[in-house]
From Swiss-Prot:
Its EC number is 2.7.4.25. This is Cytidylate kinase. Disruption phenotype: Essential, it cannot be disrupted. GO terms for biological process: nucleobase-containing small molecule interconversion; pyrimidine nucleotide metabolic process. GO terms for molecular function: (d)CMP kinase activity; ATP binding; CMP kinase activity; dCMP kinase activity. InterPro entries: Cytidylate_kin (IPR003136), Cytidylate_kinase_dom (IPR011994), P-loop_NTPase (IPR027417). Belongs to the cytidylate kinase family. Type 1 subfamily. Keywords: ATP-binding, Cytoplasm, Kinase, Nucleotide-binding, Transferase. Induction: Transcribed during sporulation. May not be transcribed with the downstream gene (a ribosomal protein bS1 homolog), there is a probable transcription terminator between the 2 genes. Disulfide bonds: none annotated. Its main location: cytoplasm. It is found in: Cytoplasm. It comes from Bacillus subtilis (strain 168). PANTHER family: CYTIDYLATE KINASE, CYTIDYLATE KINASE/PANTOATE-BETA-ALANINE LIGASE.
Length: 224
């Protein structure tokens, strides 16, 4: 029987991590864990309860009493906060622009990492985020680091938002993504960086399927 591996996919905002991770998980019949959605969920909960995102203590306290569930359905993964479906609500620009603030706090990340490690401990998972290969699943058999230019990532996010009917400005998206890159790579706790043993894939000129195929190839090599 083929060993069930842990697959870590890291990279900056809008590099195509979750789209690719879902394809890989489906192909391998693995569980997909979107760690970014977990940080978005606590950001959403904080905004709902008027908790200041810069107040680490209050945010950590809110997280302790917030139940975040990732549930796989036939329509894809659903995200629930305290039993309420927030799958669409956590994908707005308001959340996207503030999630890095919530994610930079040490106590918030420690609690999230604990939850993520529990989800990934048995293998057979594809987990994507910013610090999966370096911090959450440092022993993952397959580690991937996705890259793409800021312009390409802004273009993808723009097309994604237009499809959803959101009113967006391409230039604004470039600025927002560059700002998130800065926040993610400069934060003190688990900054965005490539694990030493990760396979780096520049996705700028590749289709989503081509990226997924490269990852699946790496998985096959490790499974032998």
């Amino acid at each position: 029987m083929e060993k069930k591996l842990s697959i870590a996919i890291d990279g900056p905002a809008a590099a195509g991590k979750s789209t690719v991770a879902k394809i890989v998980a489906e192909k391998k019949s693995y569980i997909y864990i979107d760690t970014g959605a977990m940080y978005r969920a606590i950001t959403y909960a904080a905004l709902q309860e008027n908790v200041d995102l810069t107040d680490e203590e209050k945010l950590a306290e809110l997280l302790k009493r917030t139940d975040i569930e990732l549930i796989t359905t036939k329509d894809g993964q659903k995200v629930f906060v305290n039993g309420t479906d927030v799958t669409e609500a956590i994908r707005t620009d308001e959340i996207s622009n503030q999630v890095s603030i919530a994610a930079k706090h040490r106590s918030v990340r420690e609690e999230m990492v604990k939850r993520q490690q529990q989800l990934g401990e048995k293998g057979g998972v594809v987990m994507d985020g910013r610090d999966i290969g370096t911090h959450v699943l440092p022993n993952a058999e397959v580690k991937i680091f996705l890259l793409a230019s800021v312009e390409e990532r802004a273009k993808r996010r723009y097309e994604e938002n237009v499809k959803k009917g959101f009113d967006v400005n391409y230039e604004t998206l470039i600025e927002e993504i560059a700002r998130r890159d800065k926040l993610d790579s400069e934060r003190e706790v688990s900054p965005l960086r490539k694990a030493e043993d990760a396979l780096e894939i520049d996705t700028t000129s590749l289709s989503i399927q081509e990226v997924a195929d490269k990852i699946l190839e790496a998985v096959e090599q490790k499974s032998r």
